[in-house]
Every structure is written in C-alpha cells, then in structure tokens.
C-alpha cells in the first residue's frame, strides 16, 4: 500500500535569546512573540515569552545575558508568511517606570542547522521637543500598542525611530517534509538536529 504524501511541512525552532548590548541602560528584560502568515499554525511549544530581569556583566563587554529559551513548532502548507520573531526590551527610567528600550524583528532562518543572529534594536521617537519633554516627565514614552507591527512594516515609513542597542539570538532549526512538498531549504530535509548551545556565562 502506497504511503500518502504529506499535506503540510513542519518547522521546529529552538534556541535562546542569548544576550544584549545596551550601553546606556541596565536592569533590562525581554519579551518575544512570533508573527507568521495565515497558512501557518503553531503545533507545540510557546509562541511568546518574557525573560527575567538581568544586569550588565562586570567585565569590559558589559553584556546583558538572558539565555532565555525558545521552543516552538509550526506547520504550514507553503512558505509564504515564514515566521518572524519580534523582540521588545524594557527597563526602568529615572522614575522607576518600565519603558521600552528597543524593538527588533528577524525571520527564523530558512535553512536547517544552528544559526546566530544579532538584531539592531530601535525605539519610536516623539516628533517634537515638547512631546519628548512631556513623555519623559509623565513617564510614558512612545511605544507600539502591538509590538507585532514591527514585523509587518505597514506604516513604518511614517514612524520616527532611533537606533538603540543590539540583541543576539541563537536558533536551532529543523524542517520536516519540505522536500516532499517541493521546497528545497538545504542539503538534507531533516538537518539541524543539534545539541543545545552552551549558555553564555560571565568570565570568572
């Protein structure tokens, strides 16, 4: 009896939000969520998460290390709307209010295997000095009501932003049945099964 052809393929993603560089800020935490097309659906794992608060390392790097795990599996019938991960970094201002310190997004790598990505972050800016002062005084900085707009792009061209910091991500990507559906993402359809990356740690 012939084996039925698969009707969907799987994309399995694990890894971690490893660390960040924000020279001007300390005591930060990170939120992540995935954005994907209408033909995609999560089948296992978590689509979003929030990390612990971390402080800068005491060495010359002054890195903010989270090592916050990512683990999610998607199914789809076509690659359109390939998942992106959206990051939002928050921390206290001088008044102790939680304010956004950076947004960023990147596509999940298309090829199976282990990947490292460093994402430049940005924050929305007020359009006038008066608005800047008012938002600083009131403790309410400009931010997106839905961080997922960072991955979508509509209306971004009319938003004033400022570059600020970097976040480093580690991905382990595995695909299943993409080749059977006619999609070629690499030498082997199930490559990418690797052991976990060692966590980044501070030098002794």
From Swiss-Prot:
Belongs to the B9D family. Signal peptide: none annotated. Disulfide bonds: none annotated. Transmembrane segments: none annotated. This is B9 domain-containing protein 1. It comes from the Eukaryota. The gene is B9D1. Residues 9-127 form the C2 B9-type domain. It is found in: Cytoplasm, Cytoskeleton, Cilium basal body; Cytoplasm, Cytoskeleton, Cilium axoneme. The keyword Cytoplasm applies. Part of the tectonic-like complex (also named B9 complex). GO terms for cellular component: centrosome; ciliary basal body; ciliary transition zone; cytosol; membrane; MKS complex. Its main location: cytoplasm. Residues 182-204 are annotated as: Disordered. InterPro entries: C2_B9-type_dom. One of its GO terms (molecular function) is hedgehog receptor activity. GO terms for biological process: camera-type eye development; cilium assembly; embryonic digit morphogenesis; in utero embryonic development; neuroepithelial cell differentiation; regulation of protein localization; smoothened signaling pathway; vasculature development. Component of the tectonic-like complex, a complex localized at the transition zone of primary cilia and acting as a barrier that prevents diffusion of transmembrane proteins between the cilia and plasma membranes. Required for ciliogenesis and sonic hedgehog/SHH signaling. The keyword Cytoplasm applies. It is linked to Meckel syndrome 9: A disorder characterized by a combination of renal cysts and variably associated features including developmental anomalies of the central nervous system (typically encephalocele), hepatic ductal dysplasia and cysts, and polydactyly. Joubert syndrome 27: A form of Joubert syndrome, a disorder presenting with cerebellar ataxia, oculomotor apraxia, hypotonia, neonatal breathing abnormalities and psychomotor delay. Neuroradiologically, it is characterized by cerebellar vermian hypoplasia/aplasia, thickened and reoriented superior cerebellar peduncles, and an abnormally large interpeduncular fossa, giving the appearance of a molar tooth on transaxial slices (molar tooth sign). Additional variable features include retinal dystrophy, renal disease, liver fibrosis, and polydactyly. JBTS27 inheritance is autosomal recessive. Keywords: Cell projection, Ciliopathy, Cilium biogenesis/degradation, Cytoplasm, Cytoskeleton, Disease variant, Joubert syndrome, Meckel syndrome.
């Amino acid at each position: 009896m012939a084996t039925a052809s698969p009707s969907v393929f799987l994309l399995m993603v694990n890894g971690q939000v490893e660390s960040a560089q924000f020279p001007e800020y300390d005591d930060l935490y990170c939120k992540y969520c995935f954005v994907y097309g209408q033909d995609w659906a999560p089948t296992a794992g978590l689509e979003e998460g929030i990390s612990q608060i971390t402080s800068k390392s005491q060495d010359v790097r002054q890195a903010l290390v989270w090592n916050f795990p990512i683990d999610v599996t998607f199914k789809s019938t076509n690659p359109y709307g390939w998942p992106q991960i959206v990051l939002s970094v928050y921390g206290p201002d001088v008044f102790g209010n939680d304010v956004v310190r950076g947004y960023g997004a990147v596509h999940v790598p298309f090829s199976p295997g282990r990947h490292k990505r460093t994402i430049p972050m940005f924050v929305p800016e007020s359009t006038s000095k008066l608005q800047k002062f008012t938002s600083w005084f009131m403790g309410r900085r400009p931010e997106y009501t839905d961080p997922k707009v960072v991955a979508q792009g509509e209306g971004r061209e009319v938003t004033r932003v400022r570059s600020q910091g970097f976040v480093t991500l580690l991905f382990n990507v595995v695909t299943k049945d993409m080749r059977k559906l006619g999609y070629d993402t690499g030498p082997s359809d199930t490559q990418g099964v690797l052991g976990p990356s060692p966590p980044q740690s501070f030098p002794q």
